[in-house]
């Protein structure tokens, strides 16, 4: 059964593609509509309980709070793991800015949790070729952004013994055999149907999807998974990513059996919303929509106080009388992503929604938390030398 459904809907109510996220006018992203449209499955409480049983750890708050909310074949990955069979994690980053922002932390933070919980290898694809094709930047700029972004990623604490980070511009010859096999299985009509490409688009856009698909297959990494391993065709892949990346992997799942591999499994996150509201995601293309890991404490304070959309009352009196609408309040939404303490979050939600907490108070809590995360990350990043970066990106055997 094919999984290649169009990425955008015909009613133009919301547009969700790997390059554009826009909710219906006046609304927020409808995630259940995406689940129906893409054909994925909502993560159930039973699956979370199974996850905890297999790992022996409490589920990450991203799972408990429904931030990672949808999946393809996650149950099969847990079965695979319990059977002692090999699998690996794959995620990526398109380097389009000199620093990661908080939206980028979402998949990487969860991926690190998965690596630690399951003790499995991880490959991270840096799609500097994609950004060159889609953005107004030079190849030299994309290479520079890659270098800076990789240091940001390493500083999150990934295990150097189990992590391989690669740049497409440098590693493409290793991916190319699988890129060719994938490209032969997908025709022009399918690519246009999945991604919405137009005749006026550069041909590089049409040829890129197989490049993002190739790391799903273990023989793209013979230094990690030897080609003479009799089980190589049974090694599975789990991809933590935002749900806008799903079209790439629907395509990949459709053709996996034709090139002798297992379908990649996915676990999808919601978007980290822009400061201005839930209608789109935090984006490096709009600096006013994002808080960066390179921002100063004053910049963080200024962005949250000036730009974070509030669901609170317009005056102190209104807030005390009616409380805040948490469903539209960006400050509270950010805390659901970043504040790990469930009881503290519950207390904030109660006090803010009932008017016992003012907008300025909750924004200050967020400012302090964001600055704490940024300072901790800057300290870790300062220890990432070029030598450490080179090791993470070197072609070598991993220990797992």
From Swiss-Prot:
According to UniProt, the reaction catalysed is:
tRNA(Trp) + L-tryptophan + ATP = L-tryptophyl-tRNA(Trp) + AMP + diphosphate + H(+)
Which molecular function terms from Gene Ontology are attached? ATP binding; tryptophan-tRNA ligase activity
InterPro entries (UniProt xref): aa-tRNA-synth_Ic, Rossmann-like_a/b/a_fold, Trp-tRNA-ligase
Q: Classify the source by domain of life.
A: Eukaryota
- Do the record's keywords include Nucleotide-binding? yes
* E.C. number: 6.1.1.2
Enzyme class, broadest EC rank: ligase
Keywords of this protein's UniProt record, alphabetized?
A: Aminoacyl-tRNA synthetase, ATP-binding, Cytoplasm, Ligase, Nucleotide-binding, Protein biosynthesis
In terms of SUPFAM superfamilies, this protein maps to: Nucleotidylyl transferase (SSF52374)
Where found, per UniProt? Cytoplasm
| Residue ranges of the motif 'KMSKS' region | 281-285
Question: Family assignment?
Answer: Belongs to the class-I aminoacyl-tRNA synthetase family.
Question: Under which name does UniProt file this protein?
Answer: Tryptophan--tRNA ligase, cytoplasmic
- Organism from which the protein derives: Dictyostelium discoideum
Lineage of source species? Eukaryota, Amoebozoa, Evosea, Eumycetozoa, Dictyostelia
